[in-house]
Amino acid sequence: MNEKELIEELRDCGALLEGHFILSSGLHSTQYLQCALALSNPKLAKKIAKSLGEKINENFNNKIDYVIAPAMGGLIIGHEIAMFLNLPFMFLERVDGEFELRRGFSFEKGSNFLMIEDVVTTGLSSIEAIKVVNELGGNVIGEAAIIDRSGGCLLYTSPSPRDS
């Protein structure tokens, strides 16, 4: 599925809205994607994950050990991408306002992670989540999102993975 076909499917299911929107960040946009609505359709969620997963495979060439996502927005798409890549999935959740790895999730120090979000606007949730993974001894080697409104500019750079 190419990008044009995906956009058409998102419009058809009512998830892609066009007009004038003020985002929660205060930024303005001419389009708004209701990710929860798009991902509530299992076939569409799988197509979105396949589209992102193919790009991830091209860019990371089997260097990822785990897929991780911050709850809530990244949960469904993160799990779908992990299934496409045949990798373990885990998520971070907020406890008293801070992200934590809970529910028995664990990993070996030095493991490489791919962070998945539904939408990245300011990147603040991603930055917080990446810091937690790094503090626990993991390496976030990349991030993917359905929608990137950040302009590709993150304020935080994760350490580079060790070449193997």
Residue ranges and their predicted role:
Residues 77-114, 122-128:
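Short, glycine/charge-rich flexible loops or terminal/linker lids adjacent to PRPP-binding catalytic cores
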Residues 1-59:
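Active-site-facing substrate-recognition patch
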Residues 92-93, 138-152:
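ATP-dependent adenylation/pyrophosphate-handling site
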Residues 65, 111, 141:
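Conserved acidic residues
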Residues 56-61, 105-107:
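Glycine-rich helix-loop-beta junction characteristic of Rossmann-like nucleotide cofactor-binding loops
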Residues 156-163:
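Conserved small/polar residues in nucleotide/adenosyl-binding loops
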Residues 63-71:
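Short glycine-rich phosphate-binding loop at a beta-alpha junction
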